[in-house]
Curated annotation (Swiss-Prot):
It comes from the Bacteria. Keywords: ATP-binding, Cytoplasm, Kinase, Nucleotide-binding, Transferase. ATP binds at G10, P11, A12, G13, A14, G15, K16, S17, T18. SUPFAM superfamilies: P-loop containing nucleoside triphosphate hydrolases. One of its GO terms (biological process) is pyrimidine nucleotide metabolic process. One of its GO terms (molecular function) is dCMP kinase activity. CDD domains: CMPK. This is Cytidylate kinase. The gene is cmk.
């Protein structure tokens, strides 16, 4: 399979990362979770006490980060940060850092450079509208806020993180608002993206649907 790029966008907790990961494995192409990149920046910024408004420090921080992927895990400066970037404190802060124009510009540039070298499936908030505008396959994965909150709660409890449904739902709705209303590259469905509501479908059913569409071509 040559010169293929697949863009998968959607709100927090819609299942897009899990779906994109499986598709990458099925089609034997590189999977890039762009959300992990924003989470890694958020983690490093919090560790270094860098606020979202401290633009120059954020730019210097990102430029000092050597980002790569080992399978599905994000590696920064040689360290696997996959577990650290899934902590609730990152969930609560990532949208603030991801809304910073300079942060998005630097990470989008990294993502586009990767797509020029490899066949990729990328998931995020602005893949079909910004990062891979010319991707031949674009999908917008969504689900109701309540369904997404239940999924996120299950994930967190499986990791031993104790949190209640009301707090998770509140966080999901807050992230939806920030992601959809930020000035730079807000979350929105690309006009040529196929909308898939996963509320009443299993991950396997959604993956099969997407793979069928791709293989038709």
């Amino acid at each position: 399979m040559l010169d293929i790029s697949i863009a998968i966008d959607g709100p927090a907790g819609a299942g897009k990362s899990t779906i994109a990961k499986i598709i990458g494995n099925k089609l034997n192409i590189m999977y890039i979770n762009t959300g992990s990149m924003y989470r890694a920046v958020t983690l490093m910024a919090l560790k270094n006490n860098i606020e979202p408004y401290d633009i120059e420090s954020l730019k210097a921080l990102i430029n000092s980060m050597n980002i790569s992927f080992n399978g599905n895990n994000i590696i920064v400066n040689g360290k696997d940060l996959e577990e650290d970037i899934r902590m609730p404190i990152i969930n609560n802060n990532v949208s603030k850092y991801a809304a910073v124009e300079e942060v998005r510009e630097l990470l989008v540039s990294m993502q586009q450079n990767i797509s020029k070298k490899y066949n990729v499936v990328m998931d995020g908030r602005d893949i079909g509208t910004v990062v891979l505008k010319d991707a031949p396959y674009k999908f917008f994965i969504t689900a109701s806020a309540e369904v997404r909150a239940k999924r996120r709660l299950k994930e967190l409890k499986e990791k031993g993180i104790n949190i209640n449904f009301r707090d998770v739902l509140k966080e999901i709705k807050e992230r939806d608002y920030i992601d959809s209303n930020r000035k730079v590259n807000p979350l929105k469905q690309s006009k040529d993206a196929i909308l898939i509501d996963t509320s009443n479908f299993t991950i396997e059913e959604v993956v099969d649907k997407i793979c069928t569409i791709i293989k038709k071509d």
